[in-house]
Amino acid sequence: MIAPDLDTAMTRLGEMIHEANVIVPFTGAGISTECGIPDFRSPGGLWTKNAPIMFDEFLASQEARNESWRRRFAMNDQFGDAKPGRGHRALASLYRARKVPGVITQNIDNLHQASGILPEHVVELHGNTTYATCLDCATRYELAWVRQRMDSANGCAPDCPSCGGFIKTATVAFGQAMPEDAMARAEVLALSCDLFLAIGSSLVVWPAAGFPLMAKRNGARLVIINREATEFDSAADLVVRQDIGTVLEPFIVH
């Protein structure tokens, strides 16, 4: 069912949330746009401005590593102070109410954690941009340290002092393997719920986009909240094409 208007959408969604025992949200870039973070695929989105740097390019070229870090710091300067929006805060309220055991997210902005959901209950399919790791020994580095080293080396990205490996933001680059642990945890969550909320995702990036159907085929109700149509709308029990923050705001408990 595609909700014909906002009132119908909010009423039906409220009923489904009330009736559910275990709710698993799956979030994409759309939940963070009201926080000032642009999405990737829409006109004016991040991919229309810069072609992504592939993982094999990052590994092969010092210049690519330098450019990757330059872009990351430019993004952090622009969006690093973003605060959780109404959608994040609504999901955090459902989490505190023990309706939501965990959140699956395609986002790398750390806003679910900032909203009050414990980091161990946020499954980040594409990683986290607020820190960096060595690709070889997994040593964690803070971004401020990387920036300081680059500033003192004329913009040259540093290697790991511990092992000499390449240091990269803790995100999944194009062409990089998906994190097996995160994918396994997401599958457990998807199969545990009786209501799956796909929020702000175009549902085109596989294998992550398979989780809504996995939950649906396991007997869960499926709700898709997204401004644009998705290829899974016909499988959903409720489709809401309205502003995400407006739809979820009534579920915020202060």
What are these regions (language model features)?
Residues 1-254:
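Conserved catalytic core of sirtuin-type NAD+-dependent deacylases
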